[in-house]
Amino acid sequence: MKIQLTQQIIINNKHRWYSMLDELCFKSKNLYNYALYQIRQYYKNTNKHLTYYELNALLAKKNQIDYRSLPYAQCSQQILRQIDKQYISFYNTLKSPKMKGKKIRLPKYKDKENGRNIVTYTNQCFKLKNNVLSLKINNNNKIDIDTDLNVQIVRIIHKGNHIVIELIYNKEYELKCDNKQYAAIDLGLNNLVTLTSNVCQSVIYDGKKLKNINHFYNKRKALLQSKLNGNKKTSNRIKRISYRRNNKIKDYMHKVSHLIVKYMKTNNLNTLFVGKNSGWKEGINMGKTNNQNFVAIPYNLLINMLDYKCKLFGIKMIILNEAYTSKCSFIDNEKICKHKTYYGKRIKRGLYESKHGHKLNADVNGSFNIMRLGIQKCNCDALNVVPTDKRYVYNPVRIKINI
């Protein structure tokens, strides 16, 4: 089996490549706006959609200047495909019963001066020889990137004060056989990840530093916004601290996901169950501070990182609905569903008490319940959900992440 991965190269605005890549993204924006105008006018006059194939033939025949300004015809065609997808999505939204009576906007033009658009190179548009990828930018310039990857697609994405070059490549992976050794994770705030297993020590990966990053960012952003003049919503300084904050969070998530996969590999755990609720950030009411922290933490980013890293090591990852896993008692083997009264309860913050008075970490209880759900769903014949050593249940190890 194959998995598609991406390697990113960050080009800041002082790099020697920045100006020519910026110009390339500007030309891409020009073609984007021109093609969008053609589709809008065609729809206005005929009430029909101008398809990608019709638009591509039209611009090629006219030898349109924006179409020809990009290094390769395939680069221009990728922009036309981008717009075509947006319009198909727009038409599908119009037909959706859920959107009836709601205002649906057409795809917008990009700003004439400050707008930039993505540039995509297929593997027909670059040379990869002796671990050097040569990328033509214009008639006079090219850039050489050292890489040992079998790159299939290159994307150049303008991000304001920096540009990202994405190298997209495929990698083979093979899932290991079920060895009846499982792990499950429960996601939270102070305890970002609580990992439990039926054969080894429970582990809690700290999330307090992640909260600190968000707290500092929100405080700093509010101060800078209070100094803005008129109707301005952002500034270069706000963009800069947002960029740094996003990079810190991404780095933190990479470190946590790496430690989880490394722990699973070391302990020969071949299956990971992840608890998640769809729409768990919508309409949530945990108080102002907790809402701010919970909504700001990108749990989906962590789950996606875990997904591809698990595949690279042959670990099977299964996402489950974690509803009622925190309320039901794992120790009492309580059925995981809604009850009028539950066997156990939280007696204080972070501490869960079972029916017979056993006390354990509340997140550990939730994580073990997620494992129970996973074993039931997959019809796994686990020897035992509870580890033989009870210290693995009652004494989880806390791991702090260095940033």
Feature roles, as predicted:
Residues 20, 24-27, 75, 79, ...:
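Short amphipathic alpha-helical segments
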Residues 5, 161-403:
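Positively charged, helix-rich recognition surfaces that bind polyanionic ligands
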Residues 7-11, 141-147, 203-206:
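Generic detection of short hydrophobic beta-strand segments and adjacent strand-loop junctions
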Residues 1-76:
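Gly/serine-rich nucleotide phosphate-binding loop at the start of the catalytic core
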Residues 28, 80-87, 238-246:
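Short amphipathic alpha-helical coiled-coil/interface segments
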Residues 36-43, 87, 91-98, 171:
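Long, hydrophobic, amphipathic alpha-helical segments used as structural scaffolds
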Residues 53-159, 292, 296:
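Acidic carboxylate diad motif detector
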Residues 35, 75-90, 362-374:
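Stable alpha-helical structural segments in soluble proteins, enriched in small hydrophobic residues
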